[in-house]
């Protein structure tokens, strides 16, 4: 029998979720398989001293602010709070104080930061915590297998650290319009 390390396990879960999605299998099953990979990868990223959610938020804000400084749309949802954050980071970029996403300091509580992924982990936690609320229900509108996969692939990139994605991942991201 072959030995499977955690990165390989995560890669196999993501690959399986992509295959399941392409075969139009149950969205809950696809979402949970992708979320399982994300959960594993999030912990691997943390073992490297980073926080997945904080990194994703910083990268998103930085890219939006950079776009704004170049006269392009920020690409963020309409929100006064987000606009203020993106504007502040754009000012920092223009002043030379912000040169990368790593220069952004997050002051939000960990709970607030982690709320960003609630929509991804809701179906996963629904199944995981059946002992706490055996009569709970879940709306199928809460399933977002494509979003869970995109996050899992982002976490995979962070955990891997070399910027390389397996070909099936890049094919999926191109189909989703995430990679060009």
How does the language model describe each region?
Residues 10, 17, 29-30, 34-37, ...:
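Small-side-chain structural scaffolding
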